[in-house]
């Protein structure tokens, strides 16, 4: 599973960067993200970045153990492969921004947010999901269903969930790149409000 996720994620990165280049867009991070990161590759233009792969993959086992649960293998690969900036894409007309850590500090913050998310779901007696991407509607998030491995659009704090793909690799393969400077949230035609 890890290899499939990493391969699909690498393909998303490659397609996204090619899409930006075809449109003459220089991939840069916003000014508030000018924090140190191994994603930076150009000393003369520190705002430029590209995804960076860890020499050895990390995982989320420490927080899964602390939460006394087992995380779906796909989430370890998704967040443990390395670092990246904001990747904007479309899934069947729904504009999404993939959540990716920018550096080690961001990876630690991400883990804290995942712990808080899981604890909130437990308090509400909802099945565990692990967020993957944001959408324009802040009350919804794209997540991995920890039990089934399906990718779902969920209403935060509610039981409302719509299955988008049967697996994380399938979801990633169906993403279409959006221009970095023109992320226009779209309303998905085939999902209920």
From Swiss-Prot:
GO annotation, cellular component aspect: cytoplasmic side of plasma membrane
Subcellular location: Cell inner membrane
UniProt entry tagged with the keyword Cell membrane: yes
Disulfide cross-links: none
Membrane topology per record: Peripheral membrane protein
Pfam family, one: Syd
Lineage top rank: taxon: Bacteria
UniProt keywords, alphabetically: Cell inner membrane, Cell membrane, Membrane
InterPro entries from the UniProt entry: Syd, Syd_sf
Family: Belongs to the Syd family.
Role of this protein: Interacts with the SecY protein in vivo. May bind preferentially to an uncomplexed state of SecY, thus functioning either as a chelating agent for excess SecY in the cell or as a regulatory factor that negatively controls the translocase function.
NCBIfam families: PRK04968.1
Protein's name according to its UniProt entry: Protein Syd
Organism: Tolumonas auensis (strain DSM 9187 / NBRC 110442 / TA 4)
